[in-house]
């Protein structure tokens, strides 16, 4: 894919879409399958950069797996234990938080000599909250360069026990502890300090652990968790990965802005993904939503402004911010501090790039206000190597003005076929389709 991509103005949106498997589920079940007994067949696997980093890491850790030709089915052979590697190895994990954080916790269980590292941005994403919690349970982890950030040197030693963790930065820290705890020598009691962000992702983790034979006790409204130690993960033999609801938000938003209608297949109303709440927010904004058994249909209606707390759906919240420039009144998204520690500082990035296309934007430490735009300006959008920035700003081509995305290939992190899918629902008048 070229270094920049100009999307021409779209006349209207219409079509049906099949969304690849969830990134959050894919990397979790790959890891849980590797830790389980025997063979697990995973269907509808997402095959993107973040997943490739996890697969390469598992291979280096001694796990054998097979992908089918479409790379959407993975047969993985587990070892029924935590990983223990005799030689000193280095695992490069790109900017994949869903690989870095859980692998750090799991690799802390056994005697190891493993370095975890990644891209420049990964080395800027704080991880000390998880490191501190693992150290409370006996883990021997040191920072290779800058304190509080990767790369990390792991020697093992985590035994469980009473652990405190800050829940206000990233739910992945707590998810990582939860996944490691059943394999620890001792029972683990986790006490969450401060407000827990992205709670649906914790529910997702616990749901998947249950599918692999482990139960987690949730006490005191997600402030306290209890997991028995010295357990084994048990393979479900087969597991079908839900389509990624975070990825679906861009197509739902496209219909809300410029429909026509969109039907997204492979999504159920009772999804285990927290971003199902994005669809509820669309309804609150006046968008027409119709559910079928295994799909959802979104049709354009009015698009109202909204004030919404997006603490639990930080990724989908970015799409809501884009809807703000198309809505009748402002969109106010609050309680999103963790945008600042994602693939980039997303509050800064969204504000900066939205202003380029003519939007009025007000931001604070943990909020963003986006006002409707009357006259859109063609702009070159810096994507900050952030897949969600690129996918969000693709929607600006629905404004009647073209938009140019720099480094569009960053979508490969989670959705390599995004532009192919996007073009498939775009209909143009008197211009050629984008190539």
UniProtKB/Swiss-Prot annotation:
Protein name per UniProt: 3-phosphoshikimate 1-carboxyvinyltransferase
Pfam families: EPSP_synthase (PF00275)
Name of the coding gene: aroA
UniProt superkingdom: Bacteria
Originating organism: Buchnera aphidicola subsp. Cinara cedri (strain Cc)
EC category name: transferase
A Gene Ontology BP annotation from the UniProt entry: aromatic amino acid family biosynthetic process
Catalytic activities: 3-phosphoshikimate + phosphoenolpyruvate = 5-O-(1-carboxyvinyl)-3-phosphoshikimate + phosphate
EC number, as in UniProt: 2.5.1.19
């Amino acid at each position: 894919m070229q270094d920049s991509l100009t999307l021409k103005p779209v006349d209207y949106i219409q079509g049906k879409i099949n969304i690849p498997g969830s990134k959050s589920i894919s990397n979790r079940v790959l890891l849980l399958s590797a830790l389980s007994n025997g063979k697990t067949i995973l269907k509808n696997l997402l095959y993107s950069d973040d997943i490739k980093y996890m697969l390469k890491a598992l291979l280096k850790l001694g796990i054998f797996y097979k992908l089918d030709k479409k790379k959407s089915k993975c047969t993985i052979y587990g070892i029924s234990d935590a990983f223990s590697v005799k030689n000193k190895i280095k695992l490069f994990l790109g900017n994949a938080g869903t690989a870095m954080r859980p692998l750090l916790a799991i690799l802390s269980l056994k005697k190891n000599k493993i370095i975890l590292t990644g891209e420049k941005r990964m080395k800027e994403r704080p991880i000390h909250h998880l490191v501190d919690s693992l150290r409370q349970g006996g883990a021997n982890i040191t920072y290779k360069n800058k304190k509080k950030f990767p790369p990390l040197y792991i020697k093992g030693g985590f035994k469980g026990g009473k652990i405190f963790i800050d829940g206000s930065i990233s739910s992945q820290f707590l998810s990582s502890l939860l996944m490691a705890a059943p394999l620890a020598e001792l029972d683990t009691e986790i006490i969450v300090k401060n407000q827990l962000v992205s709670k649906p992702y914790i529910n997702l983790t616990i749901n998947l652990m249950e599918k692999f034979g482990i139960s987690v006790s949730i006490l005191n409204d997600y402030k306290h968790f209890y997991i028995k130690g010295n357990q084994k993960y048990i393979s479900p033999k087969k597991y079908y990965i839900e389509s990624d609801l975070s990825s679906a938000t861009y197509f739902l938003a496209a219909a809300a802005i410029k429909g026509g209608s969109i039907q997204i297949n492979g999504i159920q109303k009772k999804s285990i993904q927290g971003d199902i709440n994005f669809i509820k927010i669309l309804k609150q904004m006046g968008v027409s939503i119709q559910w079928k058994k295994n799909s959802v249909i979104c049709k354009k209606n009015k698009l109202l402004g909204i004030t919404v707390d997006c603490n639990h759906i930080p990724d989908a919240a970015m799409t809501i911010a884009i809807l703000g420039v198309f809505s009748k009144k402002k969109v106010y998204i609050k309680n999103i501090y963790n945008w600042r520690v994602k693939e980039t500082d997303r509050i800064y990035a969204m504000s900066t790039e939205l202003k380029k296309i003519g939007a009025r934007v007000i931001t604070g430490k943990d909020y963003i206000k986006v006002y409707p735009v009357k006259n859109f300006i063609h702009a070159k959008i810096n994507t900050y190597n952030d897949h969600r920035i690129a996918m969000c700003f693709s929607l600006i081509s629905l404004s009647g003005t073209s938009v140019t995305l720099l480094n569009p290939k960053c979508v490969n992190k989670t959705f390599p076929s995004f532009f192919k899918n996007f073009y498939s629902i775009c209909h143009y008048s008197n211009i050629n389709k984008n190539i």
